[in-house]
C-alpha cells in the first residue's frame, strides 16, 4: 500500500508539472514583430472601413488603397514606432512570397513589401534612410520614392483630417474587442495591443459602431460592412508568428 500511495503521488506530480508546462506554452507571448505586423493589418482594415463607410472613390484595387492608407495612418499615429511596424509587415510579405495570377487584384508580396518601405521612407527620408537601405532601397528608386510618396502622404493626411474625431469629442462608436478563447487569439489581445487598436479606431469619426473580433477561424483579416466588424483569424496570427518569430 505505501508503494501504491508513493506511486500515485509521483504520477500526480508528473501530471501537475506537465499541465503547468502545457499552460505556460499555451500562454506564451507573441513576438513583437508579429504584433507589429498585425497592427498594420488592423490599420489596413480601417482603410477598408473608411472607403466603404464614407463612400470614398475606389479608382485602383481596394487592397492597394488600404495598404497605402495603413502605412500613412501608422506613421501619423505612431511616428516613433512606424519603422518597426512597417518593417515587420514588409518582412511578413516577403516571407509569404505569393505570386498572384496575371489578372489578380493583388500585387505580388515582394512588390507589396517594397511599396510599404518606399511609402514610409518618403514621409521622412532622413529618419528612415537606414531602414530603406536595409531593404535595398537606394539610388534612383529612392529618389522616385521620395517624390511620389510625399504626394500620397499629403493626400491621405487631408482625407484623414476630414474624417478625424475632434480632439475633445467623446468616443461612442468604437465597440469592445471580442476575443475567441484560443491560444493565438488570447496571445494577441494583450493590454498594449488593445490600447493601440482602440487608439487607431478612435481617431476616426465613425457614424456607426465599429468593432474588432479576434476569432477562431481559418483565413486572414476581413472587413464586414454589414456587421461593421474587423475580423482577424487566429490562423492568420499563427502564420505571422511562425514567419516572424524566427
Per-region residue spans from a language model:
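Bacterial N-terminal signal peptides
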Residues: 8-19
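Sec/Tat signal peptide C-region and signal peptidase I cleavage site
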Residues: 20-24
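Second-shell loop/turn segments in exported
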Residues: 28-32, 36-37, 50-62, 102-103, ...
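Short alpha-helix carrying the canonical HExxH Zn2+-binding catalytic motif
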Residues: 35-51, 65, 246
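An active-site-proximal "capping" alpha-helix that borders the catalytic cofactor pocket
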Residues: 60-77
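Pan-zinc metallopeptidase signature
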Residues: 103-195
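Zn2+-dependent metallopeptidase catalytic core
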Residues: 186-208, 240
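Catalytic zinc-binding patch centered on the HExxH motif and its immediate surroundings
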Residues: 213-245
Amino acid at each position: 500500500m505505501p508503494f501504491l500511495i508513493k506511486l500515485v503521488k509521483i504520477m500526480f506530480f508528473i501530471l501537475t508539472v506537465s499541465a503547468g508546462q502545457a499552460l505556460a506554452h499555451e500562454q506564451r507571448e507573441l513576438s513583437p514583430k508579429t504584433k507589429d505586423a498585425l497592427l498594420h493589418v488592423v490599420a489596413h482594415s480601417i482603410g477598408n472601413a473608411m472607403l466603404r463607410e464614407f463612400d470614398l472613390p475606389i479608382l485602383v484595387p481596394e487592397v492597394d488603397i488600404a495598404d497605402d492608407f495603413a502605412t500613412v495612418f501608422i506613421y501619423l499615429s505612431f511616428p516613433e514606432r512606424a519603422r518597426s511596424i512597417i518593417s515587420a509587415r514588409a518582412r511578413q510579405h516577403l516571407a509569404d512570397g505569393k505570386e498572384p495570377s496575371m489578372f489578380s487584384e493583388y500585387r505580388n508580396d515582394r512588390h507589396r513589401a517594397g511599396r510599404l518601405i518606399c511609402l514610409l521612407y518618403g514621409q521622412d527620408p532622413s529618419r528612415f534612410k537606414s531602414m530603406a537601405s536595409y531593404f535595398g532601397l537606394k539610388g534612383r528608386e529612392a529618389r522616385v520614392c521620395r517624390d511620389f510618396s510625399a504626394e500620397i502622404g499629403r493626400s491621405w493626411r487631408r482625407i484623414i483630417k476630414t474624417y478625424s474625431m475632434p480632439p475633445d469629442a467623446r468616443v461612442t462608436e468604437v465597440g469592445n474587442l471580442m476575443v475567441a478563447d484560443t491560444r493565438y487569439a488570447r496571445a494577441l489581445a494583450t493590454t498594449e495591443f488593445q490600447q493601440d487598436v482602440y487608439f487607431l479606431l478612435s481617431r476616426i469619426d465613425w457614424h456607426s459602431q465599429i468593432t474588432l473580433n479576434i476569432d477562431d477561424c481559418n483565413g486572414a483579416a476581413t472587413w464586414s460592412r454589414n456587421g461593421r466588424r474587423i475580423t482577424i483569424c487566429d490562423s492568420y496570427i499563427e502564420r505571422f508568428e511562425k514567419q516572424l518569430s524566427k
